[in-house]
């Protein structure tokens, strides 16, 4: 019986694996979902060679999408990960520990960057047998390069490694570094879950517009434009949100009537409670998925 010849794709993958072995700045992604794809897209747009990026993704449709971007996508971990200087963990938190088992033998010298919600660096360090761990909390606007990511590094991470992480996550938007890991749970509640709050209010404004006689499409367009414009105004202004709000709120006017109604309904206090619930869930996820 003859030996089957490798396919063109298999031959190309072997060649690329050999090329990566000589690279000192290769990046591996464990998980190839939306956030990983956003980071990869940002890296490629800024000139990172596709040959320097490899992804472990078990699902064939996701691998196919990644291959269209020109990066190497494999269904499982292997020796090709030995070439990675940075490993980005973009897996669901409940899958992190199991996913780490076949990877850690190949990546002990790498810097590890986790975007998995809730999993603390202590757990990640233990699972991967490495102290070079950075934890990130991005948000979904990263998918269009408009995100914000908060970062925390363990003490053993060098300034050069922190700079590299800033470069990588900066491809998806802004970055900030935190002093303590506990602050990441607050960030999760604020900006991590924050886009959902915005969408929630957009939905409410659309429904209110429809109830007042506007077509749904127009109501939604007005709401979205208002959020974009107000957000940009807040970004460029040196004045706090309270002052900006007061400037729109004339005594006895329409905005004053709306704000008074919201204050009577304790909207602000309810919003704080909602964010605290998100923070507590982030804490619980760290205990639930990272205790082993």
Please name every model-derived segment.
Residues 40, 54, 60, 69, ...:
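Rossmann-like NAD(P)(H) cofactor-binding subdomain of soluble oxidoreductases
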Residues 53, 80, 215-222, 244, ...:
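Small-residue helix-packing motif on alpha-helices
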Residues 124-132, 148-186, 199-236:
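Internal alpha-helical scaffold of NAD(P)-dependent oxidoreductase catalytic cores
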Residues 133, 183-189, 241-246:
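Short pre-catalytic strand/loop immediately N-terminal to key active-site residues, enriched for Gly-Thr
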Residues 10-75, 82, 127, 210-211:
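NAD(P)+-binding Rossmann beta1-loop-alpha1 motif at the extreme N-terminus of oxidoreductases
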Residues 21, 224-292:
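NAD(P)-dependent Rossmann-like dehydrogenase/reductase catalytic/cofactor-binding core
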Residues 2-10:
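Extreme N-terminal basic, low-complexity initiation segments
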């Amino acid at each position: 019986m003859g030996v089957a010849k490798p396919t063109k794709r298999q031959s190309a993958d072997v060649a690329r694996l050999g090329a990566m072995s000589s690279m000192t700045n290769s990046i591996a992604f464990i998980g190839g979902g939306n956030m990983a794809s956003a980071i990869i897209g940002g890296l490629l747009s800024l000139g990172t060679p596709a040959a320097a990026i490899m992804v472990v993704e078990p699902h064939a449709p996701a691998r196919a999408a990644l291959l269209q971007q020109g990066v190497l996508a494999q269904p499982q971990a292997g020796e090709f990960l030995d070439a990675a200087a940075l490993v980005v963990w973009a897996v669901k938190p409940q899958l992190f520990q199991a996913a780490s088992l076949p990877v850690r033998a190949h990546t002990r010298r790498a810097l590890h960057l986790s975007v998995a919600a809730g999993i603390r660096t202590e757990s990640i360090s233990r699972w991967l047998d490495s102290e070079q761990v950075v934890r990130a909390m991005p948000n979904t606007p990263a998918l269009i390069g408009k995100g914000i990511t908060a970062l925390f590094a363990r003490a053993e991470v060098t300034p050069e490694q922190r700079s590299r992480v800033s470069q990588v996550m900066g491809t998806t938007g802004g970055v900030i570094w935190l002093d303590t890991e506990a602050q990441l749970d607050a960030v999760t509640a604020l900006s991590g879950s924050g886009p959902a709050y915005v969408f929630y209010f957009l939905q409410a404004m659309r429904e209110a517009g429809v109830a007042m006689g506007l077509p749904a499409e127009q109501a939604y367009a007005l709401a979205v434009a208002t959020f974009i414009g107000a957000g940009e105004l807040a970004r460029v202004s040196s004045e706090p949100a309270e002052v900006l709000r007061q400037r729109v709120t004339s005594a006895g006017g329409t905005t004053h009537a709306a704000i008074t109604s919201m204050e009577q309904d304790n909207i602000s206090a309810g919003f704080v409670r909602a964010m605290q619930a998100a923070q507590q869930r982030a804490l619980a996820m760290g205990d639930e998925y990272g205790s082993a």
